[in-house]
């Protein structure tokens, strides 16, 4: 666990940047996240090969990959980085809330049975920016519910590299 930029949260939770030494932990969390998505009726958001280990290595190298720990145990991973996000240049069936600088959150994955992960991620990201954008699959109902509960506004539809559509959300603090 990298000690720099550690953010203390409630319930013995901390968030810190992942290092290359954490790669296997991040990949295991992603596999658990995939299983959770399938179980929740969202089998199509992440494929067997996405996110690839090479993508995660790049996220880590750029300093954008994070781990959420509870009492010293890794329970979630995510990517948070400053925009612009190329897939967000065009939005359909709506508009972004503003044109100000923002952070984007990607690749959120957590172990089964933990709650409040998105709230902790948003709390951390709100220390970095006053605007967050995120997208999710139409079948990812748990994520959509979390985002709405946390004050995100549905803004429209974006398309990712492979042409699949995603629901786009934004929160301005």
Role assignments for model-derived ranges:
Residues 110-127, 145-149:
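Conserved acetyl-CoA-binding loop-helix of GNAT-fold acetyltransferases
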Residues 13-28:
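A short beta-loop-alpha structural element at the N-terminal edge
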Residues 34-54:
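Conserved GNAT-fold acetyl-CoA-binding loop/helix
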Residues 67, 73-84:
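Conserved beta-strand in the GNAT
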Residues 79-113:
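Conserved acyl-donor/pantetheine-binding loop and adjacent beta-alpha core of acyl/acetyltransferases
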Residues 139-156:
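Conserved active-site alpha-helix within GNAT-family acetyltransferase domains
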Residues 135, 153-167:
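Conserved catalytic-core motifs of GNAT/GCN5-like acyltransferases
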Residues 127-139:
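Conserved GNAT acetyl-CoA-binding A-motif
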């Amino acid at each position: 666990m990298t000690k720099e930029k550690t953010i203390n949260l409630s319930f013995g939770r901390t968030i810190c940047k992942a290092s290359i030494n954490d790669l296997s932990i991040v990949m295991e969390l992603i596999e658990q996240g995939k299983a959770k998505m399938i179980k929740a009726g969202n089998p199509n958001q992440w494929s067997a090969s996405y996110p690839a280990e090479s993508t995660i290595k790049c996220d880590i190298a750029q300093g954008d990959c994070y781990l959420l720990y509870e009492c010293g145990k890794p329970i979630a991973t995510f990517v948070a980085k400053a925009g612009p996000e190329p897939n967000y240049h065009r939005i359909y069936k709506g508009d972004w809330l503003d044109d100000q600088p923002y952070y984007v959150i990607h690749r959120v994955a957590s172990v089964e049975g933990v709650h409040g992960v998105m709230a902790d991620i948003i709390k951390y990201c709100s220390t970095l920016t006053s605007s967050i954008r995120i997208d999710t699959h139409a079948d990812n109902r748990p994520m959509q519910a979390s985002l709405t509960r946390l004050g995100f506004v549905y803004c429209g539809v974006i398309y990712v590299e492979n042409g699949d559509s995603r629901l786009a959300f934004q929160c301005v603090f």
